[in-house]
Amino acid sequence: MFGYYAWLAARSLKRNWVLTTLMIAAVGLGIGALMTSLTIFHLMSGDPIPHKSDRLFAVYLDSWEPESDGQPRADPTWPSQLTWRDASHLAAAGQAKFQTMMFRAAFAVQPENTEVKPYTAVARMTYADFFPMFEPPFAFGGPWTRAQDAERAKVTVLSKATNDRLFGGEDSVGRKVRFGDHQYTVIGVLAEWDPRPRYYDVVSGWAFETAEEFYLPLTL
């Protein structure tokens, strides 16, 4: 019986090969779209740091004006990010064991190695507490301290890719690097770390972008 149905299928394929090709392509596209959706769902629904995700909180405050042009505000949603004033006051209150403000900024990198041309790189400006909160692994050295935050120390933590580019992957702790108009001392170098989505900054549109190339104290 199977052989008979296989013979009928072969005859149908030969007689309507264009339609058969279109049907196979449609099924293939459907499977591809399904697998893409399932992959994105898996990545978005996973817990990137399960041992402490129940103790990490993103703070939201309603900083909108209560009225707009004399009329009640129609959109009841809160802003996705804090104002600088609100974030600064929360940080100064120091109510959490670890807490940090952060944002991304672009700098011109001027390598000491003349064989490496200057280029623009993206940094994350943050506090020392960023590192114990989100636990990026270190290959060399370590993070700066709260005291160095207060001192506005010109120190930096490099990503693995940046350390490879500037120093050939060597232990660069103690070396100098120039970002913009200032020189910074390398205090630590991360091991490979590129979480997707970037769970520590999902509200600013960078959740699936490449990781920052270095980290600087926000107090600078």
Residue spans for each PLM region:
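Short, strongly hydrophobic transmembrane alpha-helices
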Residues: 16-48
